[in-house]
Amino acid sequence: YRLTYYTPDYQVAETDILAAFRMTPQPGVPAEECGAAVAAESSTGTWTTVWTDGLTQLDRYKGRCYDLEPVPGESNRYIAYIAYPIDLFEEGSVTNLLTSIVGNVFGFKALRALRLEDLRIPPDYAKTFWGPPHGIQAERDRLNKYGRPLLGCTVKPKLGLSAKNYGRAVYECLRGGLDFTKDDENVNSQSVMRWRDRSXFCAEAIYKAQAETGEVKGHYLNATAGTVEEMFKRAVFSAQLGVPIIMHDYITGGFTANTSLSMYCRDNGLLLHIHRAMHAVIDRQRNHGIHFRVLAKTLRMSGGDHLHSGTVVGKLEGEREVTLGFVDLMRDPYVEKDRSRGIYFTQDWCGMGGTMPVASGGIHVWHMPALTEIFGDDACLQFGGGTLGHPWGNRPGAAANRVASEACVQARNEGRDLSREGGDVIREACKWSPEL
């Protein structure tokens, strides 16, 4: 492999798709051989020379390991940079992109561990994807909500409620001041609560809350199902009910299903909320798997208006600078290379709409100043137990979150430092809000 696929003198083309792998070779295996093996197996190579190699223009189509960079402070671990010609990939297919780059290389005997840290999607390839159904600005225009983070809540307990009581919980949260409520990721269509019943009661709750508050409200109705046909049946029913947003578990549901659902949402005026269930199986190990920034990039390409991104301050894992790095990759049109934030390549999205990050998991009103400072306005903050755990009930819990959010936004706009004065801001707001 090394003689053909390790090319340190290669000049990267603007159209190349670039990958950065964190690579741990087996003892005694040269890093150059491992990097070349990854490049070969994820492009044109196989374990031996075949006679059809002579019928192929190998220099045009092969992947190339063009740089190896030792990881500081770690022995026998490298960042391998690999360039893939754009012709190796089907246009507009995240499924094909991931199948090619990570589909077959992670089980190599020569590798002790391998992790895909980042991808550079060149403009020529990015333009073949539709991206999010609507994007951040179009969502704000549809909701008529500006200048603050959006607020949500996951209905708990996630399983066990009847459809009618589930709808009642949704209504109380929306009436209290939240913008959205949410199905949990494993709420599909169990015997205790079938999807059609849940959809009908949630739609009733949405319309009642909208009429009483004068605000646009929504509930993430989970369309994820065992078959694509059933998924679309649920999405179509949601569109017929006139609700503004539905939901999909994109990793367990699959990228092909997600892209199809995203296109349906675009054509039918539905926002699409994306949950990342099962992501930690893939991205949590430091030296093996796929970093979440890659999963976030590929979701933006496949299509989703919201994506769960971690909180930095709650119960789920996430380093601040690294989290903010992939949050910017989700919502900004252009992101510069910045290794301190884990961004290995400059990324130009060529006008593709942004995906709104969703902070969810173990957060409550005392986290509101930090969340407002960290994520800014273009984020959705979701408080499950932080709403439903209020001693007075769901509606006061929702009101407390809304008051805390608006107090933090006002304090920030007045120039106050939320990182130092956040606690004082919340305590001052408590004087005017019994719920808080």
Curated annotation (Swiss-Prot):
Major localization class: plastid
Alphabetical keyword list: Calvin cycle, Carbon dioxide fixation, Chloroplast, Lyase, Magnesium, Metal-binding, Monooxygenase, Oxidoreductase, Photorespiration, Photosynthesis, Plastid
Active-site residues (renumbered): K156 (proton acceptor), H275 (proton acceptor)
Post-translational modification N6-carboxylysine, affected residues: K182
Pfam families for this protein: RuBisCO_large, RuBisCO_large_N
Matching InterPro entries: RuBisCO (IPR033966), RuBisCo_large_chain_AS (IPR020878), RuBisCO_lsu_C (IPR000685), RuBisCO_lsu_C_sf (IPR036376), RuBisCO_lsu_fd_N (IPR017443), RuBisCO_lsu_N_sf (IPR036422), RuBisCO_lsuI (IPR020888)
Cofactor binding: number and manner: Binds 1 Mg(2+) ion per subunit.
Localization: Plastid, Chloroplast
PROSITE patterns for this protein: RUBISCO_LARGE
Cellular compartments per GO CC: chloroplast
GO annotation terms (biological process): photorespiration; reductive pentose-phosphate cycle
Protein name, per record: Ribulose bisphosphate carboxylase large chain
